[in-house]
């Protein structure tokens, strides 16, 4: 569950190469003097406004190869500030032009990968603990403590699967999940509300009494509404995860996972503002456009975790440490306007490819107890972990206005990632004597600035 980015101090403007001109200029960000004397940047109140203000100052002077609509929108903003006729409308226009909503995809990428990995980790934990439950279930029968052999025999049952404390070498599982969360607005990025639902299924095999390998497939749908009705993002994700576990002893383990996810994104960015305009009969221009686009992204990640179980009676404390590495890439995309001939039709953007890497460590612990019954055993569990982000450095969003044929590039700053945060979990597992088991799980993100995420999961498993 993660993450966001940071601010850059420069705006790069690249002039398109022609037979006469091949040049590249670097224009520092806020404070730069341009043909409009930096007035728009001085009036700008947020980093996205400052970025688009610098761009408008650079491309607005006539003759810079703009479409008619884009030239008109630039002129309205410049006049609104320079003449003081509508500074508020001009600032709304600058904010509307900036694609700060683009950062939502980055947040969705890491959130989805983190939830997916947690499902598989819980699967490995229960599969492994089948071997240890007999130790925790050294309960009494009619007041007499059971011997380890008696407890093991009760846990194994009869049939071919009784040769293995897991209930059999093969295991299959199916999980369903539902998640929700929100992110507050910041100076650089638009906040959002999100919900998701998905399903993950897989199978694993007990290679030896000390090792398991498995494969899981997953699908997730996530719907995200941006604050202030400024747009939405719909994401469909499919994933495959290979996993393995090795336990040198009955109480220690090492887990490894490698996953790949493919994500399809459909998004709408709403551009809506009103500004005084000398170019309309009414003296006012009403911009109400939806910039539509779709793109794909991919994430590949791996994790390595080790832990040890300290058992006392029916209670087990499991401290652990984990290393996570994830690399994500988002394809560039080009927007098209909902009203191609209406005011604001020239404000479509083209966003370049993006990529980022996350490297985190997690240190935490889980506490589990057991309540035994005649037909099944219950295993309540709570856990918490501290996560530190080492990488995921800010990458500004690079893009250009589609109707600016000069090819001028803007760099839009984004939020810094939160380097330190936590996850909490609570769950209940029921293991039945016939090899079936079921569980419910809650996972929550805590201590992450401006971001709240929650996930609930229900699942069933069978060993045979």
Tell me the role of every PLM-derived stretch.
Residues 1-8:
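Bacterial N-terminal signal peptides that target proteins for export
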Residues 5, 17-23:
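Sec/Tat signal peptide C-region and signal peptidase I cleavage site
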Residues 25, 156-158, 207, 272-273, ...:
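Low-complexity repeat regions of mature extracellularly deployed or surface/particle-associated proteins
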Residues 25-77, 88-89, 171-187:
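Short glycine/proline- and aromatic-enriched beta-strand/turn motifs that initiate or cap beta-hairpins
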Residues 80-312, 439-463:
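Outer membrane beta-barrel translocator domains of Type V secretion systems
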Residues 186-195, 224-231, 264-296, 329-357, ...:
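Solvent-exposed, glycine/polar-rich loop segments of beta-barrel outer-membrane systems
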Residues 281, 286, 298-311, 316-318, ...:
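Outer-membrane beta-barrel porins/channels
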Residues 336, 347-464:
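Outer membrane beta-barrel transmembrane domains
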């Amino acid at each position: 569950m993660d993450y966001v980015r940071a601010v850059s101090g420069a705006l790069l403007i690249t002039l398109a190469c022609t037979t006469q001109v091949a040049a590249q200029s670097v224009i520092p960000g806020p404070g730069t003097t341009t043909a409009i004397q930096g007035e728009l940047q001085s009036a700008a109140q947020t980093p996205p406004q400052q970025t688009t203000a610098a761009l408008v100052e650079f491309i607005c002077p006539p003759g810079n190869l703009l479409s008619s609509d884009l030239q008109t929108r630039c002129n309205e903003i410049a006049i609104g500030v320079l003449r003081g006729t509508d500074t508020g409308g001009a600032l709304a226009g600058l904010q509307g032009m900036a694609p700060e909503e683009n950062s939502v995809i980055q947040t969705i990428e890491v959130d989805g990968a983190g939830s997916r990995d947690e499902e598989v980790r819980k699967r490995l934990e229960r599969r492994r603990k089948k071997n240890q439950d007999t130790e925790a279930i050294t309960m009494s029968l009619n007041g007499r403590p059971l011997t380890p052999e008696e407890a093991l025999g009760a846990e194994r049952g009869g049939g071919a699967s009784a040769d293995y404390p897991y209930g059999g070498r093969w295991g299959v599982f199916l999980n369903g999940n539902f998640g929700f969360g929100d992110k507050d607005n910041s100076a650089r990025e638009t906040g959002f509300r999100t919900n998701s639902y998905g399903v993950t299924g897989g199978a694993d095999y007990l290679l030896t009494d000390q090792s398991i390998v498995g494969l899981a497939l997953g699908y997730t749908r996530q719907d995200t509404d941006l604050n202030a009705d400024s747009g939405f993002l719909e994401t469909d994700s499919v994933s495959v995860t290979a996993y393995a576990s090795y336990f040198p002893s009955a109480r220690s383990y090492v887990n490894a996972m490698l996953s790949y996810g493919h994500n399809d994104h459909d998004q709408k960015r709403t551009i809506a503002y009103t500004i005084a305009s000398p170019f309309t009969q009414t003296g006012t221009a009403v911009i109400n456009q939806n910039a539509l686009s779709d793109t794909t992204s991919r994430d590949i990640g791996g994790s390595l975790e080790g832990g040890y179980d300290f058992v006392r009676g029916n209670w087990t404390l499991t401290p652990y440490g984990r290393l996570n590495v994830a690399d994500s890439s988002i394809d560039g995309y080009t927007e098209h306007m909902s009203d191609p001939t209406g005011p604001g039709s020239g404000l479509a953007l083209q966003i370049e490819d993006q990529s980022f890497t996350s490297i985190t460590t997690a240190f935490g612990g889980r506490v589990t107890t057991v309540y035994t019954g005649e037909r099944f055993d219950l295993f309540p569990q709570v856990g918490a972990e501290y996560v530190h982000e080492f990488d995921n450095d800010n990458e500004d969003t690079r893009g250009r206005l589609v109707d600016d044929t000069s090819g001028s590039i803007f760099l839009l700053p984004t939020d810094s990632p939160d380097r330190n945060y936590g996850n909490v979990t609570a769950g209940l597992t029921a293991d039945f004597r016939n090899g079936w088991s079921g569980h419910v799980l809650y996972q929550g993100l805590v201590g992450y600035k401006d971001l709240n995420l929650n996930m609930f999961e229900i699942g069933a498993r069978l060993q045979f």
